[in-house]
Structure formats: structure tokens, C-alpha cells
């Protein structure tokens, strides 16, 4: 029978996703066929499986840690917020509908059978499953319809390990309060606690650990230190918390506009990993003053974020950067915003709205959502400073609802290779300093990223760097470093014992 364990947290952003990835890596290293699973994920960072299904980025990088290809069954429900009260509901990788929070809460019980069937199908193929909860299991107002925390643990009949974040303070209160709010049968599933993100001497915690174990009867399985491991973040919490607000100087300064509905900011992880690059996420228009490249990222609410650009003064700051000859790149929603016109007769019903007018393009929103992995080739119309990128092969994925057409004389940035045909994508401005594309994951292609950065270095009078960072190997090293640290600081043997002791047939 399949071994299974579920990590739940005392709150959001306590580090569940990273620790799940670490366990997946450890079990993979130990020779077990392992897969991650999260029944419901709310995030704007998503990716595409090899068969064109959309799922959360967290489960994609967890699958990578487990040494397997991502499978939409690992994240059957994805909620993508489009506003403070509305979210797009993606079921098994395809858009199903949009709902407000109250309607979705009423709808959730209908999903239980599908979730269980998907989980059972994974359990039939893998030797170990590592489940992840969402937020906290102690949200007592949501308990009756829970499908992602204790409700999922009950369906899977698996033990739970509670993760608590000491960096935010009040860790023992968070552990005690969470366990106190659980029902007796729920609390009985919690077989251990991991204290995460500790800075300092663990000896200072010993008396507290002894007391919390005595108070709750639940053992603390380990104390994970704060790790400088570069792994993907699930949502915008990391941006708000300042993880990417670097202050050290690098040769190349890249400013990513932090849109209110920013999506797929994982696009820029490979950029941030480069030795000569500082990536900043900015909302202050003045923060564009020193940028060597400005990026408008993806958005889950293109027109809403376009309005914010104008109201915040960021659109004016982008135009000032253009006047200073600073290169500008738009990806997906950012690409749409850079065009002349956006026509929306689907979502908002606003009709034709003016874009920023940087690229000679017109975007029509559509009901159909394009979700596909693609290979592409950089076009030949690149400016001199980017000439080394011409003809390079890149890979990535598309996630967008809409079609963008170039006006006559506006060259494409890329040629996508789809079903044996070459399809133009993206656009280049007349001055060769502004670009747009629908392709996410572009910077994961090492040769292109180094060509772009060396072009920016050339514009600053800096010598090029010869070697390109091999981002795939870089990520593998991060997974291995995480696994090594978890083996050192967490009683992995006890986790194995918990999983084996509570191995039960699925209901």
C-alpha cells in the first residue's frame, strides 16, 4: 500500500510547500516513486503540464523535486483570484467557471468524489505521496466543507504533520491554538510538529519544546533553520514580505512592475539567480529611475492592472524610462498592456480600451484559454544590442485568454513551433527597445538569458560574461541542499515510522 503523509500549517506562508518539496526529494533519493498532492491550490503562479493542463507552480516544482513530470492530478483544483471577491476555477487543468467565495464554499462538497478518485489513481501509481494543506486546518468557519486540510486527510486516511513558522513570532501559541481548535478526531491525526524558519541557537528553544510537547502530547520532530535555498514561492506573500527586495548592487538592475494582480512571477526566478543581476519588484514609479530593463509581468486582471498603472503614475514612469532609452519587456498580460488597444467583450464588457501604445498590436480577449508548452526560436528582426539572441531556441509555456495581432510592419519576437508549423508570437517596437511575448518561462532558457544580459551589459559599457548559468542544474542543487538540511534537522526516520504505522487502505 502507498505510504502517505500530509503537511498542514498553523498559517499561510509557514513553509509547507518547500518542506513538501524537501520530503519529495528525500523519498526520491531513498528510491521511492514519490508524488506531491494538493487537492486545492489558490495561487496566481501556475504552469502547464506536458499534455497542456494548467496546475499550480508549487506542485510543479514539488514534482521536479521528486524527479517526475508534473501531472494535473497532483493539483486537481486551482483557484486563480481575479479580484478581491472573485476567482477563476480551474478543474483538472481546464477552466470551469468563475465564482465568488460564498458560491464556491457552497459548491465544494460536489468536488469530494472527484478529488478522492484522483488521489486514489495517484496512490495506485506511486509508492509515497506527500500531501499539502492550505492555510490552516483551524479555520473553524470553513470546517464543515473542508476539502484541502483535515477533510482531505480524512479522505486519504493519512497522518498529519503540523508546520509552524517561528520567524513571525508566537510559534508556541500558534501550535497550541491550532491543535486546541481541532476536533478530537482531527487532532488525533496530528502525529508531529516541525518548527520552521528558525534563526539562532536551537538550545534556546529546548525548554519551550518540552513544554509544548507536554501540553499537547504531540512530539516536535525537528527545528528547521532559516535556509538560503532558492526555490519557487507559491503566491505573492513572498513579494509582500520583501524576499525579493535586494539591496546589494549588481551590474544589471532589472525592475519588475509589481502589479496588483501579478501572475507567474516565477518567470523571473532564473533571472534573479544570475550572478550579475539584481531583480526588484517595484510599485513606486521613482523606483524605475535606475533600471537597466523594465518588465511588465503577467496579470490575472489585465484591464484592472492597466488602470492601476495609470492611476499610480507607473505608466508615466514607464514612458519616462522609454525616453531614457531603457529597454522594456512585456510578458503575457504585460504584453497586452503594451499594445495600442485591448478589446474586452468577454470579461468586463468594456469594449475597446487604450493600451500604453508602445507596441503596434491589438488584443482581443476570448472565452477560450490557451494552455500549452511550446518550443520557439528568436526571430531575425532583433536590434543590434540583442543580435546574439537571434535564432536561439527557447522553451516555455502559454497561459492566456485572448489573441494579439500585430499591425503591418511590426515584426514578431519569436516563432513558436506548434504541430509542425511556425507561428509568430510577440512584437518588437520600431526603435528595437520594447518587446512583448506570451511565452512564460522564457528566462529558463540559459543561452537566451545570457544573450539578453550581455546585451544589457554592452549598453552599459560592461564586458560580457562568457558562461551561462545552467538553471536546471542550479534548481537540482537547491533541491539537494534542501533535502540535506532536512535530513540534518528533522527526524526523517520518525516520519517514515509515522507513515508506516498509519498505512491504511483508502476508503
From Swiss-Prot:
| Claim: Chloroplast is one of the keywords in the record | no
Identify the Gene3D superfamilies for this entry.
3.40.50.880, P-loop containing nucleotide triphosphate hydrolases (3.40.50.300)
Q: What are the catalytic residues? A: 332 (nucleophile), 440
Q: Which UniProt keywords apply?
A: Cobalamin biosynthesis, Glutamine amidotransferase
Q: In which pathway does it act?
A: Cofactor biosynthesis; adenosylcobalamin biosynthesis
Organism domain of life? Bacteria
* Domain GATase cobBQ-type span(s) in chain numbering: 251-448
- What are the recorded Gene Ontology BP terms? cobalamin biosynthetic process
A GO term, aspect molecular function: catalytic activity
Report the function annotation for this chain.
Catalyzes amidations at positions B, D, E, and G on adenosylcobyrinic A,C-diamide. NH(2) groups are provided by glutamine, and one molecule of ATP is hydrogenolyzed for each amidation.
Record-stated family: Belongs to the CobB/CobQ family. CobQ subfamily.
Instruction: Identify this protein by name.
Output: Cobyric acid synthase
The record lists the organism as Klebsiella pneumoniae subsp. pneumoniae (strain ATCC 700721 / MGH 78578)
Q: What is the lineage of its organism?
A: Bacteria, Pseudomonadati, Pseudomonadota, Gammaproteobacteria, Enterobacterales
Amino acid at each position: 500500500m502507498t505510504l502517505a503523509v500530509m503537511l498542514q500549517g498553523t498559517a499561510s506562508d509557514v513553509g509547507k510547500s518547500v518542506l513538501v518539496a524537501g520530503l519529495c526529494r528525500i523519498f526520491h533519493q531513498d528510491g521511492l516513486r514519490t508524488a506531491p498532492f494538493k487537492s486545492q491550490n489558490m495561487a496566481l503562479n501556475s504552469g502547464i503540464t506536458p499534455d497542456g493542463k494548467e496546475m499550480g507552480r508549487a506542485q510543479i516544482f514539488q514534482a521536479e523535486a521528486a524527479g517526475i513530470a508534473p501531472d494535473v492530478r497532483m493539483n486537481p483544483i486551482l483557484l486563480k483570484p481575479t479580484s478581491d471577491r472573485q476567482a477563476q476555477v480551474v478543474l483538472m487543468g481546464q477552466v470551469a467557471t468563475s465564482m465568488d467565495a460564498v458560491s464556491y464554499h457552497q459548491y465544494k462538497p460536489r468536488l469530494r468524489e472527484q478529488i478522492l478518485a484522483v488521489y486514489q489513481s495517484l496512490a495506485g501509481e506511486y509508492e509515497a505521496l506527500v500531501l499539502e494543506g492550505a492555510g490552516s486546518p483551524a479555520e473553524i468557519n470553513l470546517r464543515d466543507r473542508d476539502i484541502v486540510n483535515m477533510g482531505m486527510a480524512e479522505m486519504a486516511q493519512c497522518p498529519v504533520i503540523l508546520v509552524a513558522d517561528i520567524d513571525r513570532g508566537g510559534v508556541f501559541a500558534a501550535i497550541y491554538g491550532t491543535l486546541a481548535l481541532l476536533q478530537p478526531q482531527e487532532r488525533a491525526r496530528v502525529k508531529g510538529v516541525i518548527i520552521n524558519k528558525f534563526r539562532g541557537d536551537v538550545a534556546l528553544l529546548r525548554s519551550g519544546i518540552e513544554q509544548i510537547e507536554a501540553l499537547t502530547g504531540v512530539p516536535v520532530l525537528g527545528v528547521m533553520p532559516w535556509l538560503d535555498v532558492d526555490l519557487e514561492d507559491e503566491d505573492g506573500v513572498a513579494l509582500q514580505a520583501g524576499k525579493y527586495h535586494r539591496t546589494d548592487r549588481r551590474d544589471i538592475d532589472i525592475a519588475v512592475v509589481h502589479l496588483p494582480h501579478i501572475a507567474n512571477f516565477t518567470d523571473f526566478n532564473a533571472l534573479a539567480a544570475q550572478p550579475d543581476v539584481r531583480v526588484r519588484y517595484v510599485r513606486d514609479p521613482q523606483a524605475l529611475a535606475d533600471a537597466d530593463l523594465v518588465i511588465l509581468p503577467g496579470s490575472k486582471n489585465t484591464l484592472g492592472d492597466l488602470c492601476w498603472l495609470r492611476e499610480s503614475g507607473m505608466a508615466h514612469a514607464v514612458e519616462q524610462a522609454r525616453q531614457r532609452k531603457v529597454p522594456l519587456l512585456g510578458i503575457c498580460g504585460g504584453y497586452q498592456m503594451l499594445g495600442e488597444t485591448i478589446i474586452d467583450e468577454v470579461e468586463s464588457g468594456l469594449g475597446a480600451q487604450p493600451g500604453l501604445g508602445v507596441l503596434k498590436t491589438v488584443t482581443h480577449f476570448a472565452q477560450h484559454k490557451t494552455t500549452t508548452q511550446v518550443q520557439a526560436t528568436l526571430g531575425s528582426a532583433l536590434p543590434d544590442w540583442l543580435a546574439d539572441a537571434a535564432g536561439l531556441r527557447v522553451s516555455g509555456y502559454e497561459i492566456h485568454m485572448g489573441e494579439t495581432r500585430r499591425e503591418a510592419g511590426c515584426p514578431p519576437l519569436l516563432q513558436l513551433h506548434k504541430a509542425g508549423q511556425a507561428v509568430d508570437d510577440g512584437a518588437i517596437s520600431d526603435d528595437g527597445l520594447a518587446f512583448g511575448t506570451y511565452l512564460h518561462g522564457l528566462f529558463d532558457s540559459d543561452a537566451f538569458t545570457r544573450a539578453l544580459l550581455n546585451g544589457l551589459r554592452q549598453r552599459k559599457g560592461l564586458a560580457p560574461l562568457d558562461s551561462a548559468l545552467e538553471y536546471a542544474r542550479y534548481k537540482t542543487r537547491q533541491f539537494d541542499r534542501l533535502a540535506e538540511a532536512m535530513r540534518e534537522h528533522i527526524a526523517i526516520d520518525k516520519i517514515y515510522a509515522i507513515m508506516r504505522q498509519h498505512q491504511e487502505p483508502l476508503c
